[in-house]
Regions:
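Hydrophobic core of transmembrane alpha-helices in multi-pass small-molecule transporters
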Residues: 64, 132, 144-159, 284, ...
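Interfacial helix-cap and linker-helix signal at transmembrane-aqueous boundaries
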Residues: 80-81, 112-113, 194, 198-206, ...
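Helix-to-loop junctions at the C-terminal end of transmembrane segments
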Residues: 105-118, 327-338, 426
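C-terminal ends and interior cores of transmembrane alpha-helices
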Residues: 127-140, 349-362
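Cytoplasmic helix-loop-helix junction between adjacent transmembrane helices
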Residues: 149-186
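Helix-loop-helix hairpin linking two adjacent transmembrane segments in secondary transporters
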Residues: 187-235
Length: 464
């Protein structure tokens, strides 16, 4: 063996230190290059326009793609039942797994965004979502739908969902938070408006496989926009959050803790607050009465009454038009009025609409349009007031992760309703009982939101 000189260990240590320093320099230069690109975009925009509005537009498109993906199973239900012979209960099982994981991913996604950054987390989710949807075109067995749509698509869409909206809004906006949250939440309605009639028409003419390929391509198109136009924070482009005073303290640095530890520690602290459980269970009811029941089963329900998939999808799209207006208005109202009172009216009107739904099919002209208008106006209008209440109670720093857990309740409710309504339809041959149960839950939710009291819960959270 060659001899080792006395100076060689020190020389190797120096080489290792030099290589480590060079790697740090390369990373710093890469960050500077990314920030320079963002600064160029800000310079090109110029004037009084705050870059946060452009970043919000990018987030809107992300949520739009996720909404289109989330709405796709409702279009696939009847074609899969006809072509592959799967039962509606089996398809509902896959959808319920998707919905549950969509919600349970939220708090961990919020913690991951704090630890690893918005862009890496979002890009990973979009790639997984696009690949999973494309892979589903080769499904032949119902268990494959559970794995692909339930696991892969459920987790990836959960990352780019309401938790992303809450994280982005708290980072980029000091003023107009309710309005921006309302606009971003309305992306779900816009996704239905853009995707559902088109996807239903494709499914009716060409089958269900081209549908999933179109959705996969739509999700992939958003990826470069995220890579080049979405900064991590306003400070990365030498800006403050929109509307923040000049003397406000700087935002805290990103946490280096394990996202799992952050998510569970936040849950432990928040769960000691009564307000957390009131928000959690009210959002459980929200999910059961929207994504779980109407979002999953309305097209199939219309088919039971002799309507085509395109007609059912068009009804959902019409509801999306009203929801686009209602949710944006809800965001504006949440900046100005008591959010508990807003939630009382939203849940109450939704409950009455769902109780009316089974009777709407028997009214020739005004039945379904009347339901679409009243139900659509507050379909997701509950989100801006809920986010505002969570931020007021738990503070700006903890709000995204806390809201992630509240969204988990939303999606657990949705999964419960998606599976439960499918089982009721399979055993009774009708959705009437499911509509009545869903409407009754909403009226109960309207009552419990009035019990939210910020003072004691804030004190409890701080004491913890």
């Amino acid at each position: 063996m060659p001899s080792v000189g006395p100076g060689q260990p020190m020389q190797r240590a120096a080489e290792v230190a030099w290589l480590g320093g060079a790697e740090r320099v390369r990373r710093r230069r890469r960050r500077q290059l990314e920030n320079a690109k963002m600064n160029w975009a800000v310079t090109r925009i110029g004037g009084r326009f705050h870059y946060g509005w452009l970043a919000a537009a990018v987030v809107f498109l992300i949520l739009l793609a996720a909404a289109g993906t989330r709405a796709t199973p409702s279009v696939l239900m009847v074609p899969l039942e006809r072509e592959l012979g799967w039962s509606r209960a089996a398809i509902s099982l896959a959808i319920s797994v998707n919905i549950a994981l969509y919600g349970l991913t939220g708090p961990f996604a919020a913690a991951a965004m704090q630890r690893f950054g918005l862009r890496p987390t979002i890009l990973t989710a979009l790639v997984t979502m696009s690949a999973g949807v494309a892979l589903s075109s080769m499904m032949t067995q119902s268990w494959q739908m559970v794995v692909i749509w339930g696991l892969m698509v459920g987790c990836s869409t959960g990352v780019v969902a309401l938790t992303l909206s809450a994280t982005f809004v708290t980072r980029w906006f000091h003023a107009r938070r309710g309005l921006v949250m309302g606009i971003l939440t309305a992306s779900t309605a816009t996704g239905q408006l853009v995707f559902l009639p088109m996807l239903a028409a494709i499914a009716q003419r060409h089958g269900w496989r081209p549908v999933v390929l179109v959705v996969a391509v739509a999700a992939a198109i958003v990826i470069p926009l995220v890579a080049f136009l979405l900064p991590e924070r306003p400070a990365d482009v030498q800006l403050r959050p929109y509307g923040e005073p000049a003397d406000a303290p700087p935002a805290p640095d990103a946490t280096k803790e394990n996202p799992l530890a952050v998510a569970f520690r936040t849950l432990l602290t928040a769960s000691r607050s009564r307000d957390f459980w009131l928000l959690f269970f009210s959002f459980f009811i929200c999910g059961a009465s929207t994504n779980g029941y109407v979002g999953t089963h309305l097209i199939a329900m219309c088919s039971d009454y002799g309507m085509t998939e395109v007609q059912g999808a068009s009804l959902l799209a019409a509801m999306g038009v009203f929801d686009l207006f209602g949710t944006t208005l809800s965001g504006w109202l949440s900046d100005r009025y008591d959010n508990r009172v807003l939630l009382f009216w939203y849940y109450g009107l939704r409950g009455l609409s769902l109780i009316y739904l089974p009777h709407a099919f028997g009214i020739d002209f005004f039945g379904l349009p009347l339901f679409a208008m009243f139900y659509g106006l507050d379909w997701i209008a509950t989100v801006p007031p809920t986010v505002r209440l969570a931020t007021d109670v738990f503070g700006k720093a903890a709000a995204p992760v806390v809201f992630g857990w509240i969204v988990a309740g939303h999606q657990l409710g949705a999964a419960f309703a998606a599976l439960g309504a499918g089982l009721l339809r399979a055993s009774l041959g009708t959705y009437t009982i499911a509509s009545m149960i869903s409407g009754g839950l909403c009226i109960f939710g309207a009552l419990i939101v009035l019990r939210i009291n910020r003072g004691p819960s804030r004190a409890a959270a701080q004491a913890a």
